[in-house]
Structures are given as structure tokens and as C-alpha cells.
Amino acid sequence: MSDNVPTIAAVATAPGRGGVGVIRISGKNLLPMAQALCGKTPKPRVATYADFTDADGQAIDSGLLLFFAAPASFTGEDVIELQGHGGPVVMDMLLNRCLELGARLAEPGEFTKRAFLNDKLDLAQAEGVADLIDASSRSAARLALRSLKGDFSRRIHGLVEDLITLRMLVEATLDFPEEDIDFLEAADARGKLDGLRRAVDDVLANAQQGAILREGLNVVLVGAPNVGKSSLLNALAGDEVAIVTDIAGTTRDAVRERILIDGVPVHIVDTAGLRETDDVVERIGIERSRKAVSEADVALVLVDPREGLNEKTRAILDALPSELKRIEIHSKSDLHAHAAGGFGTGAETVIALSAKTGDGLDALKRTLLREAGWQGEGEGLFLARTRHVNALKAAQEELSLAALCGNHQIELFAEHLRLAQVACGEITGEFTADDLLGVIFSRFCIGK
């Protein structure tokens, strides 16, 4: 980083009242600030009890002062932490005192961004920090910690090293352009490429599992009005999150709920019945439902077996994207016998279900996990993001194109290897545009 880097400060603990609150400060040459704040010059990595004072020397609070000298700190800069009492007024007064002494308020994720720019973390590890904080299940927390500790990064660095080795081998042959020699075969470049492709496939498979655990599955409930969508949402959520009546059109807006199935987040939207209406409020809800459908991974199509595919249900099915996965749900199975087979909804799976008794719920949950592609938490998994999966797919594609190169297309072969390396480097931040960094770190909380 540049030498002309401002000192930043922020409250590092969650908003609200608590037993302890922490102010984090990062910058260069922070000992004078510590002296002004506490009247003491702290020793590195030693907790010092002190009064935190204002400009007039009046005590604001008292607590622990910790100093981490550069480069042995989280950000790679001098870092001070003030651990005081966790009241919002006290934290605000302490933070304002830091700003008076020359710090500026940190932007979201700026501490972690500085750690990345100072080579304390790579980009995948930095994202692991945010994912650990945002983890919605124990499985997600465990896998995020693996990413933070560098498990994912080490896999990527291994791929990059193998790519560099193969590139050096192939590019060295460009100095010998004799047409009667197959350098790709002579150097076993194709054999090494096959090994690389298998390694990328393995990392990609793990990343896809990690992305499922982080991103989850988007599910919409669709069906004719009063077919039982809200009852099913309540049954899945284990709570009364949607109003249930016998009146068609009770759900006038899309109702959203998030549940966990085997640690995998499932985002469920109970759509307002997709139909034409003169009601202005209901029409807005229906438009929101259509948007939810366009973003869904799976549609649960509820059908009353006594009625089958009536005109309203057919109209709803016609409005669904043709590529959207569908699971056909025969609702209210406690009231009538399950119809054999499906009703031609385009679903590969048909489940008879009673939201009232719970029959069929476990089968539905298992089916949702299968549709998500979740294979269960195993060894070697790490939390990943969609951008990681896309980068690995790009690398996979470049290696596939390299495999198609003819025996004497060495320059093209080498170029595909280079592009595969660039794709892998985007994951760890070796090749990453500044605007992408801005997006990634802006989603962190302030103080991290």
C-alpha cells in the first residue's frame, strides 16, 4: 500500500449494549495517538489497563489498551484496540475522540481490505472473514473457517503452480519451431494437462458444494389460489408466517421465509396467486411474485388432486420459465387419496403432502436437497461463492480448449493455459479488477 494511507477507526463490536465494546484503529505510527488517548505508551501485544480521556483530560471510560505493531497485526499496519464498556454512548464518545486525533471513520470492510492489500490475507481468505461472520448454520461456520485459514486458497495456489510449470514447459518449446516434432507429446504436455483438468474438476466440485451451503436454494410456491401454498410455507417454517384462510387471494404479497435443511439455507417465497386482478395492491404483490419466480431455482407446484390441472393452474404453469425445475405437490393428502402419477406439470418428482399432519414433509426436504445438488458435508469442503464457481468453470473451459489444440498449435495451447491461470488468480485476488474489490469489501460490516 502507499505510504500516504490515512488512519482509520471504527467500532468493531456489534451495535447495541453489551458488557464489552471495542474500538479498532489502524494506520501508521499510532503510538502518539495512544499517548494522547490514554497517557501511556503501550508495549506491543501486552494488555494495558488505562483511562481513555477526552481533549481536556477527562475520563470517557476505562478499560484495556492493546497495541499491535506493524507488520505483525491483522491489517499489517499499526493497530490499536480500545476495549471498554459496551454502551452505545460510550462507544460513540470514544470513536469521536479517535476522529479528533486524526483518524477517519473506516468504510465497511476497510480493515480486511487493508489486510488483503498488505498481503496478510488473499481475497478468498478475506471473503472467508465475512462468511464466518454471516454464517447461518454450524456447517457454514465450519467451512467458512476453513476458507479463512487458507484451505481453499491452498487448493487454488496448487492449481496455479501446476499451470505455471506447464506453461514454462510449453513456452520453452516455442524456441524450436521445427514442424516435424510434436513437442506437446514429447514433453508429455497433454498428460500433464489431463492431470490439471482432473484437479480443476475436483476443486470445482468442492466449490459448488460450498456455494450451495453459502448461497442456498431459492424456492417458489406456485399454484391456484387457496390450494394450500401458505399452509405449506408455515409447515416448512414451523411457524405461522403466512395467513391461512378459505378465502382465495388472502396472500396479496409475496411472503418470504428462510429455513435450514441439513444446514443448507432454503429461501422460500409464497407467491401471491399468479392471476389477473383489478385490485391495485394485489397486483403489486403479483408482480413481486413474478420477479421471485424469475430468480428461483425450484418451483413447488401445488395441485389439488380432486381438481387436477384446472384453468388457473395451467395459466400459472404457462408463466413459469421452461427451464425452471419443478416438484409437483399433491396438497391436502389428509383429506383425500393421493392420485397416481402426476398431472403433466413438467415435474420429474411428485409428492403427496399434508401440511396439517406433516406427512410428506421429510420427503419434500430430501428432494429439495437433491435438487440443490447437496451431497452432505465431507472432508475437503470449504465455503465458496458464485464468483469462485464461475472462475473455476472459466478455467475448466480454457483447459478443455487447450486439449482440443492440434499438435503444432503450441502458441494457442499456451494462451489457453495463461487464461486458465488468470481465471484461478481472480479467486485469490492475484488478477482482480479494483471495482470488484470495491463490491466485495463494501458488503462487510463496519469495523471488520
Curated annotation (Swiss-Prot):
K(+) binds at residues 226, 245, 247, 250. PROSITE patterns: G_TRME. Binds 1 potassium ion per subunit. GO terms for cellular component: cytosol. InterPro entries: G_TrmE, GTP-bd, GTP-bd_TrmE_N, GTPase_MnmE, MnmE_dom2, MnmE_helical, P-loop_NTPase, Small_GTP-bd. Residues 216-373 form the TrmE-type G domain. (6S)-5-formyl-5,6,7,8-tetrahydrofolate binds at residues 24, 81, 120, 448. Homodimer. Heterotetramer of two MnmE and two MnmG subunits. Belongs to the TRAFAC class TrmE-Era-EngA-EngB-Septin-like GTPase superfamily. TrmE GTPase family. This is tRNA modification GTPase MnmE. The gene is mnmE.
